[in-house]
Curated annotation (Swiss-Prot):
SMART domains: EGF (SM00181), EGF_CA (SM00179), Matrilin_ccoil (SM01279), VWA (SM00327)
Cellular localization per UniProt: Secreted
Protein name in the entry: Matrilin-2
The UniProt record lists the keyword Kinase: no
Annotated spans, Disordered: 840-863
Protein's gene: MATN2
Any GO BP: glial cell migration
Organism: Homo sapiens (Human)
């Protein structure tokens, strides 16, 4: 009876009183409810305006437990539909999700599911009653972890979009709600808690946000829930201050009607400034009395123990854990306490099973460390090793060796004895056969056994025979008959007059009155020693068109180049000079080569920093280069004609296409060098649609357009494209690439300017070897159509092909280097040539359309200068008996380095006189030796190629 009275009292109280702050709203709602018989939804008359452009993430959590009957469940759905009427629903305004819960949580739709209000209304009306338990805490946890995740459509916290939960429940939860609700509120979620009927009001307050009078509501039954519609319209449509003001909250900003409050994350407390947060350390603040460890938990603390200890009943002290004392350890043999746990051990002769509890007798052979090579046999307390048939056990009692019947029986095999499983047999080497006695061997004579058909020689091989020809003959295609070798016809003999076949090669011959020079190809008149009064004291030696005097052994030539004196001290003793020994009367001094200086011991040499030790005269950058130096210019500049000053490349227009060899002979490492070479050329140009336009082709067995003339308007983007260029690494179809360049690259469709604009057109073709197709046709067409062709060859590039590609004059358009180490020098020369062409094109008004104007007149290129050193002038005790060919500019640079550029304005003739100085002759000899070394290396390469060609011809 008392329970019935209490129930009636609570029902009446719930019908009369909600919360003080909402009394007027509920009173207004009740008056509306009394008029419900006149209209289906009279509360909609209160919706004077919707929450237009209001941004919010709203999730309804609906109690769908068995205590809610079908009629009440329908009332809840009507209430939700009424709330939806004043919301501005859409992806950029209010997003709506809905969960209903009983014993489990069902996600009806998430925040990202629907984009229109009509879709949400249909989904609400289709909901089915779960009719199970009341797991309110589980539903709030689901909303916190999943419903408000960005994956489900919630907007990031940094956007300050309000997150709102509206939860409707009619009974006491079957799980804990206070802790999970507090956690949700701490993350910034605003919770409205609506209780219907006999709901514990304290439970509602533990769910809803503060102040409770604005966020916690209690109605008597589900028929009265719709009276709250206008209340929520006012609360949901109020401006969210967190998104409109600079709130300065350190962790979370929580919207409250007309204002906001700051909240901290779990484990933090709000400072007195009501915006910043600090960690809440209750272990430090209170006398916790924990014996070992104190651990902070949200709003409190707990005591914990170290590993191997357990917390006593008082929750403060710690006692050691005896894990083995418990009867459920399960160890079959022995239990041993360990740190924080226990472990099982087995008696001797047993091993612990994988379950770590039971034991099994040890199978010694089953363990992987018994060491038996063939077979392991268990014994009572150990094991023993056995060998397979045909093997015997070694002294280590584990490994086995094969029984060597050949060694035991001494069978007398002439070549090889082969062991079998239980015996042996004799075997002969390849090309031999076993005699009937089964022991000795005889060579197989294939030439005698069959009609070999060789015209000249038959040669036995291991398995057969081959025909060979006598010296001076080549084997024919039938591999049997022979033809005499015409060496003069097979090779580019290079003889000046006539070529004569020899037994193994050819020889050049000269007409009467001439003799063959040392190159073995060109001819010279009879030696000067026989024709004139040479005046040599000891002996005269002809040297091509001249002669040199030589001295007998033990003597050296004097400075006059004719008379002799005894050998110098440098040759007579072990002088110890690292570089050069120079005679000085009856003694000697040590000197160093150019680029080095003498060490303190007077014998060893140390390398100079040429750029620091000389007045190099470089306007921008000096770079050490072996025993000398070279000048370089900063980006956007090119080296002037004097090799020292720098000048800015003109900004004139040009259409330039690179044709780059990407064949496998180049290699990936050298391909990177070529990319740097291209980047250096680009740096010297002004890249823009009105100035320089640049395209790039890479070719191998196919041609790939890396970028066209129209692709890039800046050097930065262009260089980035060059850096990302992938190496093709196949064949070398240079002719195909030239065809592609001629037919496509200079078309207006790919960015070339019309011929009528008279913009110069140029192509830089880079290759490192012989092309697999013809290059002349398309190179000729390109040049005939006004495209200036620059040819750059490295390594095995063929000079004839480079000449076919390059425009005239070739000394300005053809560049060759033996390896990639000199690519910088080629780059500087090429940039200089292109810049000169641009300067020239700027100054010419009537040049033919599409033709790159010829460069302005420059100082004539250095001609090869032949220097015959017949006497030593002022250089004592030094003799040069060879003739070398060098370019004049190399010699000039050498003397300029030696003189430290003290006379930069001097004429070349004045500088030539300095070549006769002793140190310059030493430099000259060093340069000559280097050139001879390079020529020798190239000669060796040509010899190897000739030998390969002869081998192919021999077996063709």
């Amino acid at each position: 009876m008392e329970k019935m009275l209490a129930g009636c009292f609570l029902l009446i109280l719930g019908q009369i009183v909600l919360l003080p702050a909402e009394a007027r709203e509920r009173s207004r709602g009740r008056s509306i409810s009394r008029g419900r018989h006149a209209r289906t939804h009279p509360q909609t008359a209160l919706l004077e305006s919707s929450c237009e452009n209001k941004r919010a993430d709203l999730v309804f959590i609906i109690d769908s437990s068995r205590s809610v009957n079908t009629h009440d469940y329908a009332k809840v759905k009507e209430f939700i539909v009424d709330i939806l009427q004043f919301l501005d629903i859409g992806p950029d305004v209010t997003r709506v999700g809905l969960l209903q819960y009983g014993s489990t949580v069902k996600n009806e739709f998430s925040l990202k599911t629907f984009k229109r209000k009509s879709e949400v209304e249909r989904a609400v009306k289709r909901m089915r009653h779960l009719s199970t338990g009341t797991m309110t805490g589980l539903a709030i946890q689901y909303a916190l972890n999943i419903a408000f995740s960005e994956a489900e459509g919630a907007r990031p916290l940094r956007e300050n979009v309000p997150r709102v939960i509206m939860i409707v429940t009619d009974g006491r939860p079957q799980d804990s709600v206070a802790e999970v609700a507090a956690k949700a509120r701490d993350t910034g979620i605003l919770i409205f808690a609506i209780g219907v009927g006999q709901v514990d009001f304290n439970t509602l307050k533990s769910i809803g946000s503060e102040p409770h009078e604005d966020h916690v509501f209690l109605v008597a039954n589900f028929s009265q829930i719709e009276t709250l519609t206008s209340v929520f319209q006012k609360k949901l449509c109020t401006a969210h201050m967190c998104s409109t003001l600079e709130h300065n909250c350190a962790h979370f900003c929580i919207n409250i009607p007309g204002s906001y409050v700051c909240r901290c994350k779990q484990g933090y407390i709000l400072n007195s400034d009501q915006t910043t947060c600090r960690i809440q350390d209750l272990c430090a603040m209170e006398d916790h009395n924990c014996e070992q460890l104190c651990v902070n938990v949200p709003g409190s603390f707990v005591c914990q123990c170290y590993s191997g200890y357990a917390l006593a009943e008082d929750g403060k002290r710690c006692v050691a854990v005896d894990y083995c004392a418990s009867e459920n350890h399960g160890c079959e043999h022995e239990c041993v306490n360990a740190d924080g746990s226990y472990l099982c051990q087995c008696h001797e002769g047993f091993a612990l099973n994988p379950d770590k509890k039971t034991c099994t007798k040890i199978d010694y052979c089953a363990s992987s460390n018994h060491g038996c090579q063939h077979e392991c046999v268990n014994t009572d307390d150990s094991y023993s090793c056995h060998c397979l048939k045909g093997f015997t056990l070694n002294p280590d009692k584990k490994t086995c060796r094969r029984i060597n019947y050949c060694a035991l029986n001494k069978p007398g095999c002439e070549h090889e004895c082969v062991n079998m499983e239980e015996s042996y047999y004799c075997r002969c080497h390849r090309g031999y056969t076993l005699d009937p006695n089964g022991k000795t061997c005889s060579r197989v004579d294939h030439c005698a056994q069959q009609d070999h058909g060789c015209e000249q020689l038959c040669l036995n091989t291991e398995d057969s025979f081959v025909c060979q020809c006598s010296e001076g003959f080549l084997i024919n295609e039938d591999l049997k008959t022979c033809s005499r070798v015409d060496y003069c016809l097979l090779s580019d003999h290079g003889c000046e007059y006539s070529c004569v076949n020899m037994d193994r090669s050819f020889a050049c011959q000269c007409p009467e009155g001439h003799v063959l020079r040392s190159d073995g190809k060109t001819c010279a008149k009879l030696d000067s020693c026989a024709l004139g009064d040479h005046g040599c004291e000891h002996s005269c030696v002809s040297s091509e068109d001249s002669f040199v005097c030589q001295c007998f052994e033990g003597y050296i030539l004097r400075e006059d180049g004719k008379t002799c004196r005894r050998k110098d001290v440098c040759q007579a003793i072990d002088h110890g000079c690292e570089h050069i020994c120079v005679n000085s009367d009856d003694s000697y001094t040590c000197e160093c080569l150019e680029g080095f200086r003498l060490a303190e011991d007077g014998k060893r040499c140390r390398r100079k920093d040429v750029c620091k030790s000389t007045h190099h005269g470089c306007e921008h950058i000096c770079v050490n280069n072996g025993n000398s130096y070279i000048c370089k210019c900063s980006e956007g500049f090119v080296l002037a004609e004097d090799g020292r000053r720098c000048k800015k490349c003109t900004e004139g227009p040009i259409d330039l296409v690179f044709v780059i060899d990407g064949s496998k002979s180049l290699g990936e490492e050298n391909f990177e060098v070529v990319k740097q070479f291209v980047t250096g050329i680009i740096d010297s140009l002004t890249i823009s649609p009105k100035a320089a336009r640049v395209g790039l082709l890479q070719y191998s067995t196919q041609v790939h357009t890396e970028f066209t003339l129209r692709n890039f308007n800046s050097a930065k983007d262009m260089k980035k494209a060059v850096a990302h260029m992938k190496y093709m690494g196949k064949g070398s179809m240079t002719g195909l690439a030239l065809k592609h360049m001629f037919e496509r690259s200079f078309t207006q469709g790919e960015g070339a300017r019309p011929l009528s604009t008279r913009v110069p057109r140029a192509a830089i073709v880079f290759t490192d070897g012989r092309a697999q197709d013809d290059v002349s046709e398309w190179a000729s067409k390109a040049k005939a159509n006004g495209i200036t062709m620059y040819a750059v060859g490295v390594g095995k590039a063929i000079e004839e092909e480079l000449q076919e590609i390059a425009s005239e004059p070739t000394n300005k358009h053809l560049f060759y280097a033996e390896d990639f180490s000199t690519m910088d020098e080629i780059s500087e020369k090429l940039k200089k040539g292109i810049c000169e062409a641009l300067e020239d094109s700027d100054g010419r008004q009537d040049s033919p359309a599409g033709e790159l104007p010829k460069t302005v007149q420059q100082p004539t290129e250095s001609e090869p200068v032949t220097i015959n050193i017949q006497d030593l002038l002022s250089c004592s005790n030094f003799a040069v008996q060879h003739r070398y060919l060098f370019e004049e500019d190399n010699l000039l640079r050498s003397t300029q380095k030696l003189s430290h550029s003290t006379k930069p304005s001097g004429s070349p003739l004045e500088e030539k006189h300095d070549q006769c100085k002793c140190e310059n002759l030493i430099m000259f000899q060093n340069l000559a030796n280097e050139e001879v070394r390079k020529l020798t290396q190239r000669l060796e390469e040509m010899t190897q190629r000739m030998e390969a060609l002869e081998n192919r011809l021999r077996y063709r």
